[in-house]
Swiss-Prot record:
Residues 655-672 have a biased composition (Polar residues). The keyword Mitochondrion does not apply. This is Outer dynein arm-docking complex subunit 1. The gene is Odad1. It comes from the Eukaryota. Keywords: Cell projection, Cilium, Coiled coil, Cytoplasm, Cytoskeleton, Phosphoprotein. Residues 271-290, 531-550, 571-694 are annotated as: Disordered. The modification Phosphoserine is found at residues 536, 542-543, 545. The lineage of its organism: Eukaryota, Metazoa, Chordata, Craniata, Vertebrata. Its main location: cytoplasm.
Length: 694
């Protein structure tokens, strides 16, 4: 139901609308054009980004295929190269880790710079909105501006997400390019090493082939020389034995003849010869003279002739000169062969020495290779131990991550259940996040801020209903703060809300102009009189009060109180439309402690036009009644930080947010309680009534 509207305020508002109609239309058309241009730029940029991402994904896929192929080739050839490249891989890993740490530092610096820029942008926006609040504009224009700003922020958020995604892909592409470049360098080194090893193996094979050929030929020549040496040795032995035999025979004959000659001389000198012997000698001499008896020379000649005949039969040559020439030729040939055999034996000895030296070198090389292989195996064992340690650490961290993930999923499920039970408004969440069937990790703050907003709404409604039931303001304040009336506030650890939480709205007053002090007091007095006339005193609900430590809300009792409150006419909880524009505002009610020093009750209401109206009452304690526009809910989304609203009160600049009150706890024993709603447009502290109070 619409509240009373004075003629003076209506005339002033109509005059301001006529006066501001032209500039507002121009500004609105300019904003529409700017929005269209930004939409076209966003679409073009989105298409370009998606096309670039597709190209990069295709390139990444091709590079991964090439990497898999190279990895397969490297694994095939990794038997020898792996041992040689362990140290280089460790150095590369160290370098990559250092690069990763440096990149993380750079990313953090960029994030800090981005946050500083966002804060500066928000400060400028706050300054612009503060300057624009002095101009009284219609509610529709401001509502459209807020919607445009919210849409711009949503688009900026989406653009920021796409940009982050694009930056992540760029970083991954850079890492893959670096890894690919390292793999190419490693492949080139491996190919160079492979070519060198193949050349060395080829040279060794040629050397081994030449050595085997030379050793085979040397062995064959050695065997032939051995055979010839054996034959010559046997022949020399035979000739030596034959010459020794002939020499012995000749020596025996000579000695026999000498003995015989000496004996004959001795006999001849000693005695007279025997007549028979003399006769025999004479007869031998006569036979010799007659040629009947052959001498020793004749016998030797006959023997030589017999030997020549045998040689002629064996060789087929009867000429003694030719036999002598052939014999000399054979002797020369045998001597040449003997010299050749001696040379071959000396060369064979040198080759054997060289073979022995090469065998010793091969043994030493094998020993060094075995030593290097043992060292590599030890290094591999050490690296394997390090890898096992890292794997165990990663498994431990993965298990811990899984446990934390399960806890987080449970928390998300509980938050969703609490969100559904509290019947929170999810329209803003759908506008920001779209229709999703699941909750992301970064959306938890958004859901918690929405739940807390709903909780404060229910607490405020309950406190207002208790005030209607003539409950003291101190008890109503305790109920609004979620504390029990009978029990003193317990010292419990409060739940710390997110930093971007917007102050929860309380009583909703849908009005198109700010209410004055007299109008607000008249409305409250009418409500009290109507309740007294209706008679039946309302009993307080026996359900346990709501506390922040255990957020359990009795929705049935809240709905009953809401139905009872809706029956009362001229209620400040009812929504009304003004001049067909349907603009609404949300009021926030906070009550101070009755034990505090008496002071004025400040009832401030800010409409969509941003004009504050304050009132003064005579009740004890302090209270503040302040409403903010519904479009300021963007401050609690968790994506955009909004500036905190300020609230000026009597006795000094006492301003604090709802989140700071909750972080300090409600059981601190403070004598006064105040709440301010952080919005995207902080309320100005230069209102007329507040200046009057100050």
């Amino acid at each position: 139901m619409r509240l009373g509207l004075s003629s003076r305020s209506a005339r002033s508002e109509e005059g301001s609308e006529i006066f501001l109609e032209g500039p507002v239309d121009g500004e609105l058309s300019r904003l529409h054009r700017q929005r269209k241009v930004m939409e076209l730029e966003r679409r073009a940029y989105s298409r370009e980004v998606h096309q670039r991402i597709r190209k990069q994904v295709e390139e990444i896929r091709q590079l991964e295929m090439l990497r898999a192929k190279l990895q397969m080739q490297i694994n095939v050839a990794q038997t020898q190269v792996k041992r040689l490249g362990d140290k280089k891989r460790l150095a590369d890993m160290d370098h990559l880790l250092k690069c990763r740490a440096q990149v993380q530092i750079e990313i953090e610096a960029l994030q800090e710079q981005n946050r500083a820029l966002e804060k500066q942008i928000q400060d400028w926006e706050t300054h612009i909105l503060t300057q624009s609040k002095d101009i009284s504009t219609p509610d529709v224009i401001l509502d459209q501006k807020m919607k445009i700003q919210r849409r711009i922020r949503i688009l900026e958020d989406q653009l920021d997400r796409v940009t982050c995604h694009f930056d992540i892909h760029l970083v991954r592409n850079a890492a893959l390019r670096e890894e690919l470049e390292l793999l190419r360098i490693e492949r080139g080194r491996y190919l160079n090493m492979d070519r060198k090893l193949k050349k060395e193996i080829h040279l060794l094979q040629e050397m081994v082939g030449a050595l085997s050929t030379s050793s085979t030929s040397a062995y064959t020549a050695r065997e032939e020389a051995k055979t010839k040496m054996g034959m010559l040795q046997e022949r020399a032995e035979k000739e030596l034995a034959q010459s020794d035999t002939e020499a012995q025979i000749l020596l025996r004959q000579i000695s026999h003849l000498e003995q015989l000659h000496r004996f004959l001389k001795l006999k001849n000198h000693d005695r007279q010869p025997d007549p028979g012997v003399v006769q025999k000698e004479e007869q031998r001499a006569w036979e010799t003279s007659e040629g009947l008896r052959k001498t020793s020379q004749e016998k030797l000649v006959l023997r030589y002739e017999d030997t020549l005949n045998k040689l002629a039969q064996l060789t087929g040559e009867s000429d003694p000169d030719l036999l002598v020439e052939k014999y000399l030729e054979l002797e020369e040939r045998n001597f040449a062969e003997f010299n050749f055999i001696n040379e071959q034996n000396s060369e064979l000895y040198h080759l054997q020495e060289e073979i022995k030296e090469m065998q010793e070198a091969l043994v030493s090389e094998h020993a060094s290779q075995d030593k290097q292989s043992l060292e590599r195996e030890q290094q591999c064992k050490v690296l394997q131990q390090d890898v096992e340690k890292v794997c165990s650490e990663s498994e431990r961290l993965e298990a811990r991550f899984q446990v934390l993930r399960v806890q987080l999923e449970k928390i998300k499920t509980d938050i969703q259940v609490l969100f559904d039970k509290a019947q929170c408004d999810n329209s803003v969440i759908k506008d920001l996040l779209g229709v999703k069937t699941y909750m992301r990790d970064r959306d938890i703050g958004l859901f918690l801020s929405t739940i807390e907003k709903r909780l404060v709404q229910l607490l405020t409604v309950q406190a207002f209903l208790e005030v209607q039931n003539n409950v003291p303001l101190a008890d109503a304040a305790l109920l609004a703060l979620g504390q029990s009336i009978q029990e003193p506030p317990k010292k419990t650890t409060p739940l710390k809300p997110p930093d971007t939480m917007e102050d929860s709205s309380g009583v909703v007053i849908k009005d198109d102009y700010p209410m004055s002090k007299e109008e607000l007091l008249s409305q409250v007095m009418k409500l009290v009189q109507l309740q007294d006339e209706e008679g039946s005193p309302k009993k307080r609900d026996s359900s346990p009060s709501l506390t922040l430590s255990s957020p359990r809300i009795s929705l049935a009792a809240a709905s009953v109180h809401a139905r009872k409150a809706s029956v009362v006419p001229e209620s400040i909880l009812s929504h009304k439309t003004g001049r067909g524009r349907g603009t609404g505002s949300i009021s926030h009610v906070t009550f101070g402690d009755s034990a505090s020093a008496p002071g004025p009750v400040t009832l401030a209401s800010t409409s969509a036009s941003g004009l504050p109206v304050s009132g003064r009452g005579s009740q004890g304690g302090r209270g503040a009644f302040k409403h903010t526009s519904s479009s300021s809910y963007l401050g609690s989304t968790g994506y955009l930080e909004t500036s905190r609203g300020r609230e000026s009160g009597t006795g000094g600049g006492h301003s604090q947010s709802m989140g700071s009150e909750m972080s300090r706890g409600f059981s601190s024993g403070s004598g006064q309680t105040s709440s301010a709603a952080p919005a995207s447009r902080p309320s100005s502290a230069t209102s007329k009534d507040s200046r009057g109070y100050n």
